[in-house]
């Protein structure tokens, strides 16, 4: 694609088989905070790729594992499927679902699998065993928090606008002959 930097081309080449996969594309239909899961994992993946490349770690595994870390196809806030975890257990259970989905469609190496399993650490108790897994875990928390607070700020601004008294809202222009600049000259 024209106009992209070389590292962006490399990132897309590394992850193309995942982000273009039909089953993975279904993540576009499920909400994260104020974006789709697809957009969220793309952001986490790219952030992790850049960090690991800078640190001279396995940036390919980081990018691929990060892309698959939330590969679950349900709305965790609102579903009635008995086999899926209740909202309060989603944080602990969804890595297991993501790993099962990832293994069904892709071949994973040890780092990628560790990234998916441990990205919710410390909630999942067992710490990551690879530096790349730590980076993805922190990138996920940072970007999910940013999404949440951006949404919160956006909603808070809307509430404040609704509460603003009429005296503080902008007035419509009125036809005051003493303030009009394009009026006819007095005779």
Task: Show the residue positions of the predicted features.
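Metal-dependent phosphohydrolase cores
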Residues: 1-187
